[in-house]
């Protein structure tokens, strides 16, 4: 993918604000400038950013319906009613179910959990699950990470004598389900100050409110924060505000005292003994938690997450790891087929957006394939498979473009849809696919902005190699946890040269190990450029080039700072 480098020289006002903040907090101007770009301009705001405190969490009772939800839960416990904790089959849903179930189980035993089967029941609340709940004399269902659009299903549940408390974060329609309580910060009438909680985050706020109402110490919620960190990373929600607090302390819990289930996953991932980051969750832990829901049933994942015996958890984690290996092979095959289809379509006509359909593709993997196609071709993408005459799948978007609105514009062709700005799930009749493709592509072509069609690499600062020190790297660590709205800072250095020892490495000679010299300071830095071996010939030509990179620690040489190079371009003459 070709990236457009996006760098804005700081204004005189920003320079002055940077200097003042750097003096106040005793930090380099480079780091102070990163804070200014994140809207942090005072010493107290910087302190809150670097050291988020759990006592800064928002009062959960500011969320609409929270008092009603807590009262109904207390009432259910008082009446000894059977309670079901129900959730989506992805990471966010499974961690949310595990969190709520584990916490409530400490105080109440007449409770069970339920994850719908992706292939048999589909997304959200199924009639099958409601019939099962009625057969088990369930009187209250707490649904997590789904349910905000389940109007017919919750009306049916009401006929069965089952009440619902919805804990969701997806965008609601104008009409809301007839649940007892709807906890969703994205409600149109929401007064909750932070709008970007994930499903597990909403579940945590519910348990925080329940604990507060019942005089349960907040400290009893802390062991569950590792679930929050995993869900925030995997669901790719903004790591700002309340999410930053939950992610910061959740990572701390994950590193210092993870739950038994999480500890077994960490071991299976080969991460034991390492300081875990949000990237480890996104690329290592999250895919394994997701794997059961993609190729088998998400109930296996919750079984693991609530397990108390480490040896049993390790056995379950090994099985889930096998599911992940199976998922990776399916993913590889489907991605190859998807790329072939796109190349064929592109040879005929440029596509403003991509819609792919293959009835043989596995339903649980289409979301991953949609993400890969979006990344490769940098266009809004929908990938669909088929089950019993109904096509279902996932839509993924590019930075800045709201794919939810694009899908919503075609709602008369759809059976169901729901999601966020950048990710939507949808289903429709197979015969509607051609018209959906036409209208979806037309809507995108009319609404996407030119700058949204280019992959941007947002550079935060231009620096010389002399500025890159171990202290700078250590101070940069304080900006973590990273994620949307708080990305890992990208730096740029211009007019660098190969120091003479750069070489192509890797099993397939796909990476470049670099030793570079900065023409302005004559300082030398080591770096690694993954998947960029095509640039090796230019690098060895003794001409200057510009690089964009993050500053990392060399995991093989502890204490040595190196550059992880994200892009390389010839210097402008």
Model regions and ranges:
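Hydrophobic helix-and-loop "lid/oligomerization" segment in the mid-to-C-terminal part
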Residues: 2, 10-140, 160-161, 211-438, ...
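Acidic-glycine-rich active-site phosphate/pyrophosphate-binding loop
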Residues: 75, 171-184, 516-521
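Mid-to-C-terminal polyanion-binding domains and interfaces
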Residues: 75-81, 312-356, 409-573
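Short alpha-helices
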Residues: 99, 175-216, 221-233
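Generic beta-sheet signal
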Residues: 114, 144, 167-169, 183-185, ...
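Short gly/pro/ser/thr-enriched loop/turn and capping motifs at secondary-structure boundaries
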Residues: 119-121, 150, 170-175, 189-191, ...
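Conserved acidic residues
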Residues: 139, 180, 546
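Intrinsically disordered, low-complexity regulatory tails of plant transcription factors
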Residues: 150-151, 235
């Amino acid at each position: 993918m070709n990236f457009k480098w996006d760098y804005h020289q700081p204004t005189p006002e920003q320079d002055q604000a940077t200097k003042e903040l750097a003096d106040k907090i005793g930090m380099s101007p480079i780091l102070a400038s990163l804070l200014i770009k994140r809207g942090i301009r005072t010493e107290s705001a910087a302190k809150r950013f670097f050291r988020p405190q759990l006592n800064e969490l928002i009062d959960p009772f500011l969320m609409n319906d929270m008092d009603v939800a807590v009262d109904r839960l207390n009432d259910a416990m008082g009446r000894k009613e059977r309670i079901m904790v129900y959730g989506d089959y992805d990471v966010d849903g499974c961690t949310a179910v595990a969190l709520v179930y584990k916490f409530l189980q400490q105080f109440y035993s007449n409770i069970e959990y339920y994850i719908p089967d992706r292939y048999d029941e589909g997304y959200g609340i199924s009639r099958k699950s409601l019939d099962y709940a009625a057969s088990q004399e369930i009187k209250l269902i707490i649904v997590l990470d789904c349910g905000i659009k389940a109007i017919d299903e919750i009306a049916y549940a009401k006929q069965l004598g089952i009440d619902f408390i919805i804990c969701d974060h997806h965008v609601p329609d104008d009409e809301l389900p007839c649940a007892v309580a709807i906890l969703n910060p994205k409600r149109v009438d929401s007064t909750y100050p932070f709008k970007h909680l994930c499903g597990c985050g909403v579940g945590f706020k519910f348990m925080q409110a329940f604990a507060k109402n019942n005089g349960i110490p907040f400290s009893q919620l802390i062991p569950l924060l590792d679930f929050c960190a995993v869900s925030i990373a995997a669901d790719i929600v903004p790591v700002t505000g309340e999410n930053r607090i939950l992610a910061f302390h959740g990572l701390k819990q994950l590193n210092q005292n993870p739950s038994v289930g999480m500890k077994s996953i960490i071991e299976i991932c080969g991460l034991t003994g390492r300081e875990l980051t949000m990237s480890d969750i996104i690329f290592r832990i999250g895919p394994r938690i997701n794997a059961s829901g993609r190729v088998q049933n998400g109930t296996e994942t919750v079984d693991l997450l609530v397990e108390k015996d480490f040896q049993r958890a390790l056995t379950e984690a090994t099985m889930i790891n096998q599911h992940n290996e199976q998922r990776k092979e399916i993913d590889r095959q489907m991605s190859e087929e998807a790329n072939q289809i796109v190349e064929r379509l592109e040879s005929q006509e440029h596509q403003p957006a991509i819609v792919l359909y293959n009835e043989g593709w596995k339903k649980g993997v289409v979301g991953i394939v949609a993400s890969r196609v979006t990344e490769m071709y940098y266009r809004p993408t929908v990938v669909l498979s088929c089950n019993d005459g109904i096509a279902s799948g996932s839509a993924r978007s590019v930075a800045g473009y709201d794919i939810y609105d694009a899908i919503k514009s075609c709602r008369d062709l759809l059976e169901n849809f729901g999601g966020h700005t950048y990710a939507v799930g949808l289903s429709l009749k197979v015969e509607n696919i051609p018209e959906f493709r036409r209208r979806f592509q037309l809507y995108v072509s009319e609404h996407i902005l030119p700058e949204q069609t280019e992959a941007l690499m947002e550079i935060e600062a231009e620096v010389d190699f002399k500025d890159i020190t171990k202290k700078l790297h250590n101070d940069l660590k304080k900006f973590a946890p990273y994620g949307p709205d708080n990305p890992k800072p990208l730096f740029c250095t211009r007019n660098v040269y190969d120091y003479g020892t750069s070489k192509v490495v890797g099993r397939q000679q796909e990476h470049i190990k670099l030793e570079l010299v900065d023409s302005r300071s004559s300082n030398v830095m080591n770096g690694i450029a993954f998947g960029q071996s095509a640039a090796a010939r230019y690098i060895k030509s003794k001409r200057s080039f510009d690089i964009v990179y993050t500053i990392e620690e060399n995991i093989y040489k502890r204490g040595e700072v190196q550059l992880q190079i994200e892009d390389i371009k010839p210097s402008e003459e």
